[in-house]
């Protein structure tokens, strides 16, 4: 499969697996749009990835996702890597953290997919 000339949006790509994937796709000729909550982290990440640009997004905020999807434009592929995790036991559930994990890890993904699927 050739990635040359393709555009990929990587959400949660300012570090770790997302950044590594952005670097790999770029090496294969793809244009990559990196997104995360931190503009500063994205600036550092994009500096090391040719054919990249950044769009800040908070996947827990529907308006932010809508704005980001509009800024990203048409894409050939989407990779959702955003996520948070706070370990907790069933005996010590922290409702606010549990809700945040669900909102970012699951609902956030659904928000992003819903925003870009009509354009793909």
Regions found by a protein language model. Name each.
Residues 113-114:
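A short, exposed helix-loop element centered on a Lys and neighboring polar residues
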Residues 28-45:
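Conserved glycine-rich Rossmann-like NAD(P)H-binding loop of the short-chain dehydrogenase/reductase
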